[in-house]
Swiss-Prot record:
One of its GO terms (cellular component) is cytosolic large ribosomal subunit. GO terms for biological process: translation. Belongs to the bacterial ribosomal protein bL19 family. This protein is located at the 30S-50S ribosomal subunit interface and may play a role in the structure and function of the aminoacyl-tRNA binding site. This is Large ribosomal subunit protein bL19. It holds the Pfam family Ribosomal_L19. PANTHER family: LARGE RIBOSOMAL SUBUNIT PROTEIN BL19M (PTHR15680:SF9), RIBOSOMAL PROTEIN L19 (PTHR15680). InterPro entries: Ribosomal_bL19, Ribosomal_bL19_CS, Ribosomal_bL19_sf, Translation_prot_SH3-like_sf. The keyword Thylakoid does not apply. The keyword Glycoprotein does not apply. The gene is rplS. Keywords: Ribonucleoprotein, Ribosomal protein.
Length: 116
């Protein structure tokens, strides 16, 4: 039974997802449907967590908009997400960056990872 579920899950996995980790800054293009119209909205922020595996994998992006922190959780393999752009790589030592919620201003900035 699990082999059948794995094959169904593999059919709905996306192949165009970049390799990103918590601490990275990403630009998520989300399809928003308003009435009978649809448009693409961008949500740019820092990935604070990545959770799950396979079809159920999700990631949470945090940004500060007009001095209010906004977090949004997206499924990785959903068709609502048009594309995920990796803007910068962050240098962090944790897998879950919940401590960023308490920080303000420059303290909430993440160092950029240097290519070596």
């Amino acid at each position: 039974m699990s082999h059948l579920l794995d094959s169904v899950d593999a059919a709905s996995l996306r192949s165009d997802v970049p390799a990103f980790r918590p601490g990275d800054t990403v630009n998520v293009h989300v399809r928003v449907i308003e009435g009978n119209r649809s448009r693409v909205q961008q949500f740019k922020g820092v990935v604070i967590r990545r959770q799950g595996a396979g079809v159920r994998e999700t990631f949470t992006v945090r940004k500060v908009s007009f001095s209010v922190g906004v977090e949004r959780t997206f499924p990785v393999h959903t068709p609502i997400v048009e594309k995920i752009e990796l803007v910068t790589r962050g240098d962090v030592r944790r897998a879950k960056l919940y401590y960023l919620r308490e920080l303000r201003g420059k303290a909430a900035k993440i160092k950029e990872k240097r290519d070596s």
